[in-house]
Amino acid sequence: MQIEMKDIHKTFGKNQVLSGVSFQLMPGEVHALMGENGAGKSTLMNILTGLHKADKGQISINGNETYFSNPKEAEQHGIAFIHQELNIWPEMTVLENLFIGKEISSKLGVLQTRKMKALAKEQFDKLSVSLSLDQEAGECSVGQQQMIEIAKALMTNAEVIIMDEPTAALTEREISKLFEVITALKKNGVSIVYISHRMEEIFAICDRITIMRDGKTVDTTNISETDFDEVVKKMVGRELTERYPKRTPSLGDKVFEVKNASVKGSFEDVSFYVRSGEIVGVSGLMGAGRTEMMRALFGVDRLDTGEIWIAGKKTAIKNPQEAVKKGLGFITENRKDEGLLLDTSIRENIALPNLSSFSPKGLIDHKREAEFVDLLIKRLTIKTASPETHARHLSGGNQQKVVIAKWIGIGPKVLILDEPTRGVDVGAKREIYTLMNELTERGVAIIMVSSELPEILGMSDRIIVVHEGRISGEIHAREATQERIMTLATGGR
């Protein structure tokens, strides 16, 4: 299938989202669509699949002018969109998820389960996926759920699959599996639109790249004819001199220490510390127990055994409220479900953990609150028309900045960052890194969990590696390599 989008314009209210965007997709190619958060990538694909209607512009499919009125119609014509938030019903079986709304029944209305299972198995075999059709989809890993979505798309005879941040929550093994599947689909003439911020993946799997900036097409080129620096420059409109801004660490005393901490079934006998002004990176494969550790240290989950020491004093943290009072902040990996109130304003999200600062006598001083929020919006360069904009309407990078702003506002001594730049574009990433460095200069201790090895290597002073719920090693940043980290993460020595 060949797709041509020409001079596409789209406005939401007063906000011009797309201004004359053009995009072309050839049969059997993997085409990267890149741009900073808010550049208009998802809006463009939503117009293609009929979720939104363009104000102006032309869409041609195989040379014929074509417009879809809704995503289901696009799917019926062979175009499937796999969103970053997967469309999976966790309490239903794998089979039920595959055939939801497309069940096969006899003339008497009896479900033909055997026939559906045969068709499902046929698709899974094509994808080399081994998965029980009777298990609940919620029991599957994110990588397996993604394969369910791909199989679902292929069962509608999809010729084009749009993938939005497909590897954001995948393990290294699942990413390799996804790339194998994409390569096989490509050989069968299926085209892939690959929306991602992960530059390494773009250069590994894609044939061409279209770069967008501020709702416009900047360039379309063959991957073989460009490089990392050129793509970044076109995305952000300027050169980023360094991917990871340099800093000279000034390390103080231990401000946070964990001794022999365990939570049954999650992690065991964990001990580590972080000093003021230090960034400790926590690396490991997905499922190793890193997030579970951070949740327990912040009081979200209860420790079974172990001790927590803050500024040299043994303390107990029974819940997040106690953690905040004792100077801890926690930026969760799941910003949409746990980090933000999506249908609440930016102002309310940022002010929420800081309400006591604006209400010394029980009444909120709205002037002080507004000044505080405006200061943080400017400081973190959160792109918004108003502090009253609901968090739901922000791009991924700006949502993450709101989460960071609300925790910076409490003035933490120790800040836990769990996947701080997941789903964030390269420009916003660098802004977050710069902010982390500024916080350490003020003496804040940072614990950073990340699945991106370049980020771990580029930002950490020390690196703790977790394997199957235990700390398998600790490396100073000067001695760390990707190979050494991966060896420890997979149980090697």
UniProtKB/Swiss-Prot annotation:
Enzyme class: translocase
Catalysed conversion reaction: D-ribose(out) + ATP + H2O = D-ribose(in) + ADP + phosphate + H(+)
Pfam families in the record: ABC_tran
Keywords carried by this UniProt record: ATP-binding, Cell membrane, Membrane, Nucleotide-binding, Repeat, Sugar transport, Translocase, Transport
SUPFAM superfamilies, alphabetized: P-loop containing nucleoside triphosphate hydrolases
Membrane topology term: Peripheral membrane protein
SMART domains recorded: AAA
Locations listed in the record: Cell membrane
GO molecular function: ABC-type D-ribose transporter activity; ATP binding; ATP hydrolysis activity
E.C. numbers: 7.5.2.7
Record-level GO cellular component terms: plasma membrane
Binding site for ATP: G35, E36, N37, G38, A39, G40, K41, S42
ABC transporter domain segment(s): 3-239, 246-493
Function, in words: Part of the ABC transporter complex RbsABC involved in ribose import. Responsible for energy coupling to the transport system.
Stated family: Belongs to the ABC transporter superfamily. Ribose importer (TC 3.A.1.2.1) family.
Subunit structure: The complex is composed of an ATP-binding protein (RbsA), two transmembrane proteins (RbsC) and a solute-binding protein (RbsB).
Protein name according to UniProt: Ribose import ATP-binding protein RbsA
Taxonomy of the source species: Bacteria, Bacillati, Bacillota, Bacilli, Bacillales
Gene label: rbsA
